[in-house]
């Protein structure tokens, strides 16, 4: 049963075909990695899946439903969460408040109830706070919860973003280069964390440059080059794939 | 419609269309150099005509106009160097709000200096009753001045931007700021130049229409929004299109009297702006690609 | 609970200030203080839009005018001639009409002020909903220009329409009876009561926004302001949220306009002027953009001073200068404020003190 099924996905910018007829399936509860040299179209692919961009052609099936071209907030409501390559947190809000945004899709209170401070919203707020704290504790950043994220160390900010995505209890988590900017030790911890998250029942789709991380934790690897899928398989298969090695020749990866 | 009335509307459209086009050109020069909309653009037009009017009693008209243009240019430069340069780091919105504040202050200063009264300038040639005849239509010679000077402004700017070093430098800056500065062009000087030019052109435009439209301290705001409508219509940054758009809008406004009571004349133009913004913000003649090729 | 303090203070002032001013023989100040409260209400609505949703609007005065004119037009509309028509009969049966007599003693049959008021608010909300969707898709200067255009259109319409009184506006606007014995109206005898009404309304309006900011929707708005893309990815329907704040801002302005009109007994096209919109923006800017308390204090102070005539002929110029000054110095001012606050909290030790947008 695949959690994500892409077929014939294409998107051009001007004359440039950033993503060209890409199709693959990501199995439920797998950790699927998307790799490829710079400019291969990985981030564009992510944006097509999450709805930030709409494809010129092709379809995206998420958990059985067609979400092609759906607006990001609708996709999020269906159980897809993502992190961003450049950290996109609310700098002026605390870590806890940022994570609480993650609970937005799991709560209902609207403008009117908010303005009137309707009694039933108090219970909901409590639950939002509790669930957010769970995510924060899972990532081990509880000591930072009341600090403005703008002033936090980079690695901690990444954790806050991850906690935010987790708080939404997604079925599928999209991670956009989660290891970028992390040192060796932090990357190790990240690898363990991703596996732990998957083991809690979240399918993972990750774009990453760090090959050791990818080879270490992935169940499936999809390789893109110049917008096309050129290979897919288990880590060992990919490692010995001639074409894949070719496109990486000249690139220094761990 | 009677021929005379038609011509009256036509000429009115021509006159006001020209001044809107001049304001739009001023908007475009600054937009191309800085990416911001200068809400105070209309005030430059007001300043030019008011200063010239104040001076015209004491010196020959040509001198008064020249002085007004120079002084308004100085005002434009001052505005940029004293205020906008400081706010530039804060982002586009901050600069916009600053220009709004500046337009108010300039307007109030004009009110304090010259009062509420409506002022005018002497006709450049002849007087208010002289008229020329072309194809049976009577019109004031001032109209020729307006058309002529607007054409001169457009021609002059085209030559400036194509042939002079400064002009090419400005175009380089607007196309690629970093690249230009790597070539030794100081972007900040270009911005100052842009403001100076916009102010001077606005002042000149204000002077040439003043004999027919009169002027007073509060004309700036209306001109700004109409000038913006024209600029947006032609595609922000495209001044050649602005001229055509200006005439179009001027005519539209003038002839709208047929359908709509005079009191609502402005509403027509503003509705055009709103429809434009909602439907095709890149302008009638513009497109996303064209706006990246912005000329002057 | 600290965030409720400003609203509570307003409510307290509603009852404590009148006797205090009466005792110091400065009761005449109540009039300007009442009017200031209504103007601040409009500014608060704008603060929600500008500070929390990050959208600039130069058309707030337009919504103020819509509320003011609609409410006064509907409550001065003489339906006597149409008394026979079925609709009017129906309204009469349901008690939604009020009877009186005009200046000359002739019978006056009009919509009850409550009905007029509610209709005016609904109208403002409807117009906001209508233009909000396309307007809010715009960014930066296009948004500023579009809202400016909207404000100008409203001003031209109310100034140019005979039926709305043209340049003279509408007068003889009847009092708005909120409860038996309690009405929004001019007149010295009702001065203290009206002051209380205005400041209670202000307190309630502030309370609603304070609640909003710390609610789920408010959190989403703040996230939206800080990054639309991330907010959308987290499930926030950014377009709808922006529209909702826009409508809230419009409703606040309309309520303020309607109530002020009943208080003054008249309304003129000057209230729809662009300069008024600029004032609302200036007040929000001085207050600190996303700072409700700041807007409250700055608004009360500046409006009161302006209404007292302290700025004299330079009234408009002052607000223009304020805008410029805030733009020039606000960043530095805020940074200064933060670093001194930071020094204070550091001195208290790392007690995990909460920071964030002030409510």
Feature map (PLM): residue ranges:
Chain B
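Short, non-helical or kinked segments that cap or interrupt transmembrane helices
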Residues: 27-49, 89-94, 166-169, 187, ...
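Helix-loop-helix "hairpin" substructures at the membrane interface of multi-pass membrane proteins
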Residues: 16, 138-216, 239-244
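Alpha-helical transmembrane segments within multi-pass membrane transporters and channels
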Residues: 27, 59-102, 109, 244-249, ...
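Membrane-embedded helix boundary and interhelical linker motif in transport proteins
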Residues: 11, 33-78, 82
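Membrane-interfacial amphipathic/re-entrant helices at transmembrane-helix boundaries
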Residues: 1-22, 51, 59-64, 90-95, ...
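Short loop segments and helix-boundary regions at transmembrane helix junctions
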Residues: 33-37, 74-118, 160-167, 221-236
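Cytosolic-side transmembrane-helix boundaries in multi-pass membrane proteins
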Residues: 82, 113, 118, 175-189, ...
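Transmembrane alpha-helical segments in multi-pass inner-membrane proteins
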Residues: 20, 59-70, 192-202, 206-273
